[in-house]
Amino acid sequence: MKITILAVGSEAQYQPTFDTAYQYLKKETADLSAELSYAICRPEAAELFAALRTATGQSEAVVLLLSPEPAAVSTALRVVCSGLERTASVDAALQRQLETRAARMGLTLGYEQLPDLASFPAGAVPLPNEQGLVQGYAIPARRQLLLALPALPGELSAMFPSAV
């Protein structure tokens, strides 16, 4: 089995975070005897679309590790929806929860950022992140699996064993 991990976000800001998350996923998938590959993509639609297209052509599973920067989440959502020809829908209850959680964390998010954090592609299985703002989801497609997961290691390790 081949798994491609695409970390989405600023390499300058998040490379140590991505590296730690990759090592965690490598450990968690060791029982699968999977071959893992890993790349970092800027949150730019054309670059991510090309990387995702290549990865889906070469792997049984693709994992998008999403940095907490809003551009990473929104770009990944749009690219996944475009590539799979699906629409995104906002979970209004989750959006309210995330707004409250962000306030508790002392973060101010723009009104336009909250819907993307609470949106999922049609047909995706939500993978809740109870600790942070970046939510996960899984999309089984043909003989492949696409996962979008938070890149922050504490959030990833808290949700991965139970959700994935």
Region locations from a protein language model:
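Glycine-rich phosphate/diphosphate-binding loop of Rossmann-like nucleotide-binding domains
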Residues: M1-R42
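Proline/glycine-rich low-complexity loops and linkers
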Residues: E47, A51, G57, A61-V63, ...
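Short beta-strand segments at enzyme active-site cores
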Residues: L36-A39, A61-L66
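Short strand-loop junctions, especially beta-strand C-caps/beta-turns
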Residues: V8-E11, S67, A151
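Generic alpha-helical propensity signal that fires on short helical segments
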Residues: A21-Q23, L52, V164
